[in-house]
Every structure is written in C-alpha cells, then in structure tokens.
Regions:
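Conserved N-terminal beta-strand and adjoining loop/helix that marks the start
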Residues: 1-18, 38, 69
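A conserved beta-turn-beta hairpin within the catalytic core of GNAT-like acetyltransferases
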Residues: 26-31
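Conserved acetyl-CoA binding element of GNAT-fold acetyltransferases
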Residues: 32-37
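Unchanged
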Residues: 39-62, 68-122, 126
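Generic C-terminal helix-cap and adjacent flexible tail
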Residues: 128-132
C-alpha cells in the first residue's frame, strides 16, 4: 500500500509560530495543529499546502523550504507528513476560523506544552530542537 501525503505549514511572526485549534468533535477536535491537510491525488505537496491554507485560513502563502518529514498511520493507512516553512502574503492578517475555533502565535518553546495533533509532534520536535 502506498503512503498518502499530508502537508503542514509553519508560519512565523517575529519569533512566534502560528498554531490553530481544531473545532470540537472528531478524532482531533480541540487539538492544536499547524495548518495543512492531505494532498489530493496527483497534487504536489507544495500545491496542496497552498490550497489547504487558503481553504482553512483564508490566507495566501508562499511555500519555503521543507523543514520536517515523518511517517504516521491514520486508521491503518500509512501517511507521510511533510512540513514546510511558509511566508504569509500579508503579515498583518490573522487567519479566518473556518475549520478551527482559535489560533495563537506561540514561542517555539511553548509547543511542548500544547495539546497538539499527534502527527504534528514530528514537526514540533524539529522546531523545538532548532530553537533550543
């Protein structure tokens, strides 16, 4: 079985990073995450990230370097998570709350204290090590 691709984007504002809390309900309801989602069939990871950010946050981004990659399983399906740094097109805009009920800009050292979606721990661990 081939692995599906999931993408996440890490945006900075000063020294802080954007995290968003999923709406209540479902397996990840109420947990914090880096905005992103699953790539559609035939969609490249960077294209998927741009689309997902627009759908979830209403924000337009430029996708930068890959910063983390890891594997996890969701309902028995192997998924490859690829995280990229992203730059917001408008640095003074806040995200819309479409699939989330809250957002915050956090210092990377605070990531370990948040109730993050399990798959995003891969990304948080890389960010925490780099900011130590």
């Amino acid at each position: 079985m081939s692995s599906r691709i999931s993408v996440a984007g890490v945006a900075h504002r000063g020294n802080n990073i954007l995290v968003m809390r999923r709406l209540p309900g479902g397996s990840v309801g109420g947990l914090w995450e880096f905005p992103g989602g699953k790539a559609e069939k035939g969609e490249r990871p960077r294209e998927a990230l741009i689309r997902e950010w627009k759908e979830e946050t209403g924000l337009e981004i430029a996708v930068g370097d890959e910063i983390a990659r890891g594997e996890f399983h969701h309902k028995g399906v192997p998924i490859t998570l690829i995280a990229f740094s992203v730059e917001l097109s408008s640095t003074d805009s806040d995200p819309d709350l479409r699939e989330h009920d809250a957002f915050q800009w956090v210092n990377p050292r605070q990531l370990s204290r948040l109730a993050l979606v399990d798959s995003d721990r891969i990304v948080a661990d890389v960010i925490s090590r780099e900011s130590a």
